[in-house]
Amino acid sequence: FFLIVGLAPGMHGANKTGRPFTGDHAGILLYKTLYKFGFSNLESSQFVGDDLILKNCRITNAVKCLPPDNKPSHEEIKNCNKFLQFEIKLLKKGSVLLALGLIAHNAILTALNLTKKEYKFSHGKRHNLPNNLVMYDSYHCSRYNTQTKRLTEQMFEEVFLLIKNEMER
């Protein structure tokens, strides 16, 4: 199974539609890539009733509510971590997590009671986690990151290729 962990609901995305990355800029690259690698039946998601079906994957966020100024506070991240911890506990052994950005990366580590020092964030990096879980890091697919070329479509697809290969082992 494949769990994608984002930052928080976007104002024009999940906060408005109820589905993570649906209807916002970050979702454009995410859903296109999910489709390309066989994790969804549609190439895009603009609204909840669009018949999107995710295949062997789920999308969640480190923070569950819309943060002020689109950046969650340390307290919001901490308060929501118990929900992420619960979601991770439900994963079967051998599942793969994708951390979209440093905040999601750190939230996953906190949920698993792991230290950030031992698991440094780096785009495309693979981390072995307890319970035979694996985490991959990626820069967040935000408008800012894609427009500044911090994250390109090719870079994002390379991480998904690693994940797809991991899941096919």
Give the label of every model feature segment:
Residues 1-121, 125, 129-169:
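A polyanion-binding, active-site-adjacent surface
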